[in-house]
Amino acid sequence: PFFFNDTATTEIYTLSLHDALPIFLASAANWVVLVCGSEGYGNYRHHADIAHAYQIVKAGGVDPDHIITMMYNDVPFATSNPFPGKLYNHPGDDVPDVYEGVVVDYEKKEVSPENLIKVLTGDESTGKKVLKSTKEDNVFLFFSDHGGPDILALPGGYLHSKDLLDAINTMHEKEMYNKFVLYIEACFSGSMFLKLPDNLNVVAVTAANDQESSWGWYCGSEAVVKGKSLGTCLGDEFSVYWMEDADKGEQKTETLDEQFKRLVKGVTKSHVMRYGDVSFKEDVIGEFIGYPKSRNAVPYQHSFEQWDSRDNEMLFRLYMAQHTTGKEQKKWQQLYEEEVASRKAIDRYFNALAKEAKYYQMPEPVENTECYARAIKQFEDIMGRSDYSLKYFNVFANMCNENPLAFSGY
């Protein structure tokens, strides 16, 4: 503990802000929540994104007890993975295994909206690690997965923007943070924060605006590590860009605003957005992810093969069908044809449900979460869950905004 008498306090205030800051932050701590919300080898990139982020914050000196990781955790050991127990977020021969040493706190169906809310609000009924941060501490959350209008996908269900914003308000009321930064990699991720207040010391940076997909990076023929093809995407454009920037080790000097501007300029396939409170945009990013030294920094390279996240599963299966032989080729060809057939069935469902063009426009913020959730459940009970179908959920949002009683007869 630090004890200051009046004289010492006076002397501290005579220091420059840069010199004094470490003294005042000495009792503060960093907390990090990392969430991979997908499963299946076709979603390799999300697992690799989160594992890479774990390495960055751990190397930055964040207490491992303050890092909470949620990951389905099937991809590292999938039969399709040519490197069992390893994950790579960048192609090449001399690239690090980002899965090494990663501690997963919530896995399989434990990765649910309910548990994520409990983690954020410090609800220990999970019996597992949750945030125990205080009003002196900074919190950083990184999420990588699929999304749709007003929702983020998790293996255990969908996180609606209202529920996330309610959790943030609870954190604010319980004084669980000094400043809170969220980085969100998902399609339509901007839609989660259209109602985020600008006075809570919370800022969210999203891979896409509220109307577009985010994109897989280092995909297909480019996803080659140590001479072996992984067949899918190694990362996502937004995630790869901010983490390979962080790997340079400039966290003591680079500000949140500087990194945001680099992301806006560097991410080419979607529009990086920022929501909430920007009053602390000049804070250095190390205040949230720690101060790692450059750790095998791999120079960022523009990917020449990118996949729309909506098409990733189909393109992955097609790639495998084209690059295998014999029984394996037949298996992947059948899986590819099944995916194409599923997508056509989903197209037909929505064409029959909503014939008017107005329903296909991007909605205003979802006003009736209960109706929206009912619509999604009704669809998935009939058609099953699909990453591809998320592109159509704006139809549900628009119909529910127009008539809150829609889908209530189900």
Where are the language model's segments positioned?
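Short, small-residue-biased leader/transition segments that mark boundaries at the very start
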Residues: 7-21
